[in-house]
C-alpha cells in the first residue's frame, strides 16, 4: 500500500502524523511511504531521518496522492482536492464537523476519525485523545508556572518563608489528572473539581483535594455517571452550585487550569467574568 504523510498546515500546528519509528515499521511490512518535504521539521524531525528508514520525500501532491493518507488534523478544501477518490484518510478529523464530513463524502474518501475510537482495552492503541490530553495537562501546568510571578513550592529562607502556590484544576479527566500530578511534583497545593464523583479517589490518590459539589437529584446523579469515561452536560441546578464552589476556590487560587470537556459540544464555562475580576493580582488562568 502507498501511504502518504503530508505537512500539517493549520496555524500553530507542530505535530506530524508519523514518526521515523512508525514509518520504519510500515516499510518493514511492505508498504511504500511518501512524506511531504518538511513535514516533521516543527517536530524536530528532519527529512533525512525519514529517508534513513526508507521513506520517499516528495511534495504535497505526492503525499496526498497516496492510497492511505495520515493526517493530524482534518484536511482543508485545497488538500481534499489533491486526494484520490476512493482513498483512505486517517487522523483526528473532528467527526462532529458536518461540513467537513460532507466534503469528504462528496470526494469519495473513506475517513476514520481516531478521536471517535471507543475507550476500551481492545482499542487502547487507537486512543489518541488520551495521549494528547496527557501532554496537554502536563504542558498546561508548565505554562501556568512560567507566567506565575512567584514560586510553585514553599521556599524557606533566612529572610522568610514563601508559601506554596495554590492550584485549582477544573475537570479531572486524563488532562486534569496529569495536571494534578505535575503541579504536585512542582510543590504546589492542589485542588480539583469534576462532575463525576467516581474520580474523587483518583484525585485524592495524587495528593490533591477534591472540591465536592453534592448531587441532590436523580437527574444529577444520572448525568454525573458520564458515558464511556466522558462527562455529560449537568442540570442547571447543579451547575449553579458548582459555579459558587469554583468561585470561592478560584479567589484563593494562584493558578487555575481548565480542562473540562464534553465531546461534540462547546466546553462548559466554569469561570465567570465576575470571578476573574475578583481573583488575586498576578494569578494565572490556563
Kindly give the residue locations of the regions a language model identified.
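Glycine/serine-rich phosphate-binding loop and adjoining beta1-alpha1 elements at the start
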Residues: 2, 8, 77-166
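Short, ordered loop/turn segments at secondary-structure junctions
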Residues: 8-10, 37-40, 74, 94-95, ...
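An N-terminal-biased, well-structured beta-alpha scaffold segment characteristic
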Residues: 2-103, 107
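Residue-level detector of alpha-helix initiation sites
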Residues: 74, 135, 173-174
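Glycine-rich phosphate/diphosphate-binding loop of Rossmann-like nucleotide-binding domains
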Residues: 6-45, 153-249
